[in-house]
C-alpha cells in the first residue's frame, strides 16, 4: 500500500484545520443565534396600569360636593387590555378642545390606557371632569411639553355657545406630581371661568377640568388633581 509523503500529510492537515474551525464557528454561531431567538422581548407595557386600575384612582363620588352627580355617558375606561399608542401633534392645534372634557387630546398624543368621568351639578350646571392617561417610557413628559406648545399657540379661541372670545392663560404649577401645568379660561360672557390642570406622575398624566366655585374653578381643580395623584401612587404600589 502506498503511503502519503510527509509533505502530503502536512498539506492534508492544513486543509482539514480550516474546515474544522469553520464547523466549530458555525456551531457556536447557531447556538448563539438560538439563544438570542429564544430570549423573550421586553413587554413595553410592563409596570403600566390598565384602564380598570386607573378607574380606581379616580376620585369617588364622596369627594364631590352635594348636588354633583356623575354623568353616565362620560364615564369610560380602556378596560383590562392596552391599546396601541399614537402621536400626531397638529402644526396648528384645535384650541376649542380646551373647552371640553378630554381636553388633553389637544396634544395629539394617545396612550395605552385611560379612565375618565365627569360630575355635573344639576342646580348650577357646574362641571368637574377627571381623566388619567398612561403612556410608555418617557412619553408622558413629552405630552406635557406638547401641551405647553399647544397652549402657547392658543392665546384665544371662540366659544361655540356665546360666539365670544375665550382668553387662555397657561402656567407651570408646583406641588402636584412630577410636573404640572395649569390653564385658566376666562370669558366676559361667562358667569365663571374654567381651570384645567395637567399633572404628570411617572408614566401617567392626570387631567382635570373645573368650573366649580367663584374662582374659575381653581381650588377644586387643584384639590382634585392632588387627590388623584396620591391615589395613583397607591395603585402602583398595589399593582
Map each language-model feature to its residues:
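Short, well-ordered beta-strand elements
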Residues: 129-131, 203-212
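Hydrophobic helical h-region of N-terminal Sec-dependent signal peptides
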Residues: 12-17, 21
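A short acidic/glycine-rich loop-to-helix N-cap element
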Residues: 208-224
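A small/polar (G/S/T-enriched), proline-flanked helix-loop surface module common
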Residues: 68-192, 218, 224, 232, ...
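Extended hydrophobic
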Residues: 193-204
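Post-signal peptide N-terminal segment of mature Sec-exported envelope proteins
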Residues: 33-57
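Bacterial lipoprotein signal-peptidase II cleavage site
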Residues: 6-7, 20-40
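Bacterial N-terminal signal peptides that target proteins for export
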Residues: 1-12
Amino acid at each position: 500500500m502506498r503511503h502519503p509523503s510527509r509533505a502530503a500529510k502536512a498539506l492534508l492537515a492544513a486543509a482539514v484545520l480550516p474546515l474544522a474551525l469553520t464547523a466549530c464557528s458555525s456551531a457556536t454561531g447557531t447556538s448563539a443565534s438560538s439563544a438570542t431567538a429564544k430570549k423573550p422581548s421586553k413587554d413595553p407595557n410592563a409596570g403600566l396600569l390598565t384602564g380598570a386600575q386607573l378607574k380606581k384612582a379616580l376620585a369617588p363620588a364622596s369627594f364631590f360636593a352635594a348636588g354633583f352627580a356623575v354623568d353616565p355617558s362620560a364615564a369610560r375606561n380602556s378596560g383590562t387590555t392596552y391599546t396601541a399608542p399614537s402621536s400626531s401633534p397638529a402644526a396648528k392645534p384645535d384650541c376649542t378642545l380646551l373647552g371640553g372634557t378630554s381636553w388633553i387630546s389637544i396634544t395629539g398624543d394617545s396612550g395605552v390606557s385611560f379612565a375618565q368621568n365627569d360630575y355635573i351639578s344639576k342646580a348650577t350646571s357646574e362641571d368637574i371632569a377627571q381623566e388619567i392617561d398612561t403612556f410608555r417610557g418617557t412619553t408622558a413628559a413629552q405630552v406635557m411639553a406638547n401641551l405647553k406648545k399647544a397652549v402657547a399657540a392658543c392665546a384665544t379661541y371662540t366659544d361655540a355657545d356665546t360666539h365670544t372670545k375665550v382668553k387662555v392663560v397657561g402656567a407651570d404649577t408646583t406641588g402636584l406630581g412630577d410636573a404640572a401645568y395649569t390653564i385658566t379660561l376666562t370669558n366676559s360672557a361667562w358667569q365663571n371661568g374654567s381651570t384645567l390642570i395637567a399633572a404628570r406622575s411617572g408614566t401617567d398624566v392626570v387631567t382635570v377640568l373645573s368650573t366649580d366655585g367663584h374662582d374659575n374653578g381653581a381650588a377644586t381643580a387643584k384639590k382634585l388633581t392632588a387627590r388623584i395623584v396620591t391615589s395613583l401612587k397607591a395603585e402602583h404600589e398595589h399593582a
